[in-house]
């Protein structure tokens, strides 16, 4: 069923898809190579609940931002990954991080602090394009690993 939007405003439409408290956190964590339910649940510092995480994963998949592949050794485990549509949200995450760093007078976590340090002398476009290309390489490795094994497990 197609998503119903509140208006024809582009900003409102995007917020209807990912404007809740958790969706961009899940996208961020996928960029950080947290790709199983357990990793998404336990490795972030925000303490998302299992039902909220399940709901956001479902909504992000239905909206085409993410997909998953079953683990090659344990088909109960899903490895979530960003689609190209989801990867393009990297620009949004980057801009939100830069805004926070500029205007919020506070100490940030180690990941954010490290990110600001290593990117401070780099152009916005370079940081975004490199982040996207590195993620795509890792995603492709993940998919190749799990999909190739599934091909070999076919019985004749």
Label every PLM stretch briefly.
Residues 45-71, 75:
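Canonical helix-turn-helix DNA-binding module
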């Amino acid at each position: 069923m197609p998503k119903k939007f509140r208006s024809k405003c582009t900003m409102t439409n995007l917020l209807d898809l990912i404007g809740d408290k958790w969706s961009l956190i899940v996208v961020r964590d996928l960029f950080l190579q947290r790709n199983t339910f357990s990793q998404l649940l336990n490795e972030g510092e925000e303490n998302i609940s299992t039902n909220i995480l399940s709901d956001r994963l479902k909504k992000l998949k239905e909206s085409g931002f993410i997909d998953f592949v079953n683990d090659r050794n344990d088909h109960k485990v899903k490895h979530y990954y960003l689609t190209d549509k989801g990867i393009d949200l990297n620009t949004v995450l980057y801009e939100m991080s830069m805004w926070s760093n500029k205007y919020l007078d506070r100490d940030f976590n180690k990941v954010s602090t490290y990110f600001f340090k290593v990117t401070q002398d780099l152009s916005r476009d370079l940081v975004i394009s490199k982040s996207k290309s590195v993620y795509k390489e890792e995603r492709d490795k993940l998919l190749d690993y799990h999909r190739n094994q599934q091909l070999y497990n076919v019985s004749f």
